[in-house]
Amino acid sequence: MAFNFNWSPLMADAGFYTRAQDLLTAALNKSPKPPIIVDDIAVTELNLGSIPPELEILEVGDLAEDRFRGIFKMSYSGDAFLTLKTRVQANPLNTFLITRPAYASPKPLAAASGLTIPLQITLSNFRLSGFVVLVFSKQKGITVVFRNDPLESLKVSSTFDSIPSVRDYLQREIEGQLRILFMDELPAIIHRLSLRLWVPEYRGLEAGIPETAIPSSLGPGEDTLLNPPKDPVDASGNLLSSAEIASLSLDSGVEMHSLFSQKNLLRLAALTNSQRTLSLFTPSIREVMFRARTGLADQGEGLGSGLMSPGSPALSRTHSHISSPLSSFQDSSSVLSLQQRSTTAASSFSGYGLSLGAGRHTKARPTKKRKKRVVDLRKQSKPTDPEITSADGGYTETSTASTTFSSSTVPEEVNDDPVTPPLSPETTIRFPNRQHRFSTSEGKVIARAPAQQLTYSEPSHSALHTQTANPVPAVPLHAEGAAVPPQQALVFGDEHLGSREKSMEAQSSHGPNPGLSITDAAPNSSILEQAWMMKMANEIARRIQEQNSLVNNNYPGPWEQTRARTPPPAYGQ
């Protein structure tokens, strides 16, 4: 089975093209148009070309003399073209590029009406491919339905081809509109054309209906500059009468476009006075200061009005100081006020938040130097005459010669002249203990023996060894009736002191010996042995005195045992 398509009669019939153009114009204006197109779309030229489409029969469902139904595969790559004409809006503020909401977009009054530009579009180089269902009947005409989207590509040429963005936009929009046209509008257009050809009743019915007048041309455009507004005003806002407007001309020196409408001036005033938020015609709110208008000067004035914010610098300087617990045990004469001293042991807390004002006041304030009340008991560099201060401070004694022995020093050999006395030793200051202070307050007299002149001789090897092994520095004697040289400090180690205390207790059990002196020693003993015996007698007498004071209960109270203990030895001489 074969079919013969005669494409040339369609090209030769002038009435066919006219009817097809009218139907295409109605179909293009039926669907909603994009906002950039502000006028109707008119089909000014239509040509089917000389190349017919290619059809391939896939299925034949019904075949008779007056009807046919079948499925075809169609492909078209001919030279048909279509020319459209319309007008588009050239206002850039009202185009497809706007993506923000309308309430947030400014709408200047100068471009509210929009500028329209004529646009001519030519569609050519159609590429179609799809499946077509064809139904033919002499009583009902021809019905063509596309099962898929047949449009593959086409070429769009317009007056804005020099602008790439507009060209691409028109290409996309027209392709979308043609796809809708092929699927929805083209089958209806073909059906109506077939009815005119084969159904005489439809042709007579259509001839009785008057055709609607379609404007062929729009004529010359009106010059908006020569048509003043209804309520014209000049640049100063003064209303103009009709006589003044009539007297104006293009040659009068006053241009017509300087006339503004009073309504437009009011809108411009509202635009100027608006807060520039949301819509431009938002009514202003009284007694409201927007944050965009508040600067540093306004913030400074707000802070000086008497209302302090929580983070203001004035509050960040408020601090509370907590002193260390050790400061309560210090001497009252050496403790300074907390406001004049800042130490590392003190903890400071902010008065309003822990981090307010941190790092602003890092420089420490100048403070007074803390006084140190320390008595220097060490040696003096210059040898002076020693002075002994009694407990009551009544008198002083000076010793001309006093011998001091130390375990760390070895005595040098003396000169050949045994008469020459050595230099006076350094001063040894000994503060009386509390026992001596109490005994002085009770009226006890402490006898001071005059200084005893000692001469050195060449010591023997055994005596020197004994002296070095048992160091016995001299101490003042605090016993009654004992003639001992003053300013001789006796310092024992812990092991020697314990052994001597035991021996002293044994001697005190037999009774005190107040008559003990250095004269009891053998005359043949050496001078060093006599000095050592004198020191031992002084220590025994002092221990006896302390025991007697404890028996007499001179120190009542819970601290008497602590007070009665032997005071620590003085600094090394």
Curated annotation (Swiss-Prot):
The keyword Mitochondrion applies. It is found in: Mitochondrion outer membrane. InterPro entries: Mdm34, SMP_LBD. GO terms for cellular component: ERMES complex. The keyword Endoplasmic reticulum does not apply. One of its GO terms (biological process) is mitochondrial genome maintenance. Residues 374-385 have a biased composition (Basic and acidic residues). It is a multi-pass membrane protein. Residues 301-326, 349-433, 499-521, 550-573 are annotated as: Disordered. Keywords: Lipid transport, Lipid-binding, Membrane, Mitochondrion, Mitochondrion outer membrane, Transmembrane, Transmembrane beta strand, Transport. Residues 1-195 form the SMP-LTD domain. GO terms for molecular function: lipid binding. Residues 306-316, 396-409 have a biased composition (Low complexity). Residues 360-373 have a biased composition (Basic residues). It comes from the Eukaryota. Its main location: mitochondrion. Component of the ERMES/MDM complex, which serves as a molecular tether to connect the endoplasmic reticulum (ER) and mitochondria. Components of this complex are involved in the control of mitochondrial shape and protein biogenesis, and function in nonvesicular lipid trafficking between the ER and mitochondria. MDM34 is required for the interaction of the ER-resident membrane protein MMM1 and the outer mitochondrial membrane-resident beta-barrel protein MDM10. Component of the ER-mitochondria encounter structure (ERMES) or MDM complex, composed of MMM1, MDM10, MDM12 and MDM34. Lacks alpha-helical transmembrane segments, suggesting that it resides in the membrane via beta-sheet conformations similar to those predicted for other outer membrane proteins and porin. Belongs to the MDM34 family. This is Mitochondrial distribution and morphology protein 34. It comes from Uncinocarpus reesii (strain UAMH 1704).
